[in-house]
Amino acid sequence: MKQWWFIILLIISFPLKADNIFVEAESFDCRGGWVLDNQSMGQMGSPYLLAHGLGVPVENASTVIRVENGGKYRVWVRTRDWVKQWDQTASPGRFELLLNGKALEVTFGTERAEWHWQDGGTICLKTGENRVELRDLTGFDGRCDAIFFTSALEMLPPDGKEELTVFRRNMLGLPENPEDAGEFDLVVVG
């Protein structure tokens, strides 16, 4: 009898595993008119996509995510409002996130000057392939670092650099230390 209580206690104590999908914006299949910007890698540990259209909205960036368990997910988009540091009220770097052709109700790039996870609300993802797009609204430097979908609706991804690095590594299944490829005098990339 005591064994059953112990098993029940274990089941109640550990929440069910959430379904998480972490998408680096720079890994989109098609960048459209968005460009890869790596100027903040020292601060963030990752490059991001930038919609630099000189006032003309750029072509959508797009990718496909594969969802094992369809259902309700919360969406988080890592972004920033680059003019908030000057106390500006307008947010020129606004963009939308489209899922399977439908824009979320939230406009991104409108909240804070520093990089952060902006809440996109809850959505329903279907099992299988789902198309994700970034739609620039202004052509004035919208910024997207990553998108995080989670079935743990109350979960907030970390913002601190060290915590985010560990989180990103875990979500992408990367090792803690890079594989040692040996010593070389010259490396040619490209």
Which positions does each model-derived feature cover?
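Short, flexible, glycine/charge-rich loop motifs used to bind or transfer phosphoryl groups or to couple energy/partner
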Residues: I11, L137, P175-N177
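Extracytoplasmic
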Residues: A18-G173
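N-terminal signal peptide c-region/cleavage motif recognized by signal peptidases
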Residues: S13-P15
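Sec-dependent signal peptide recognition
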Residues: K2-I8
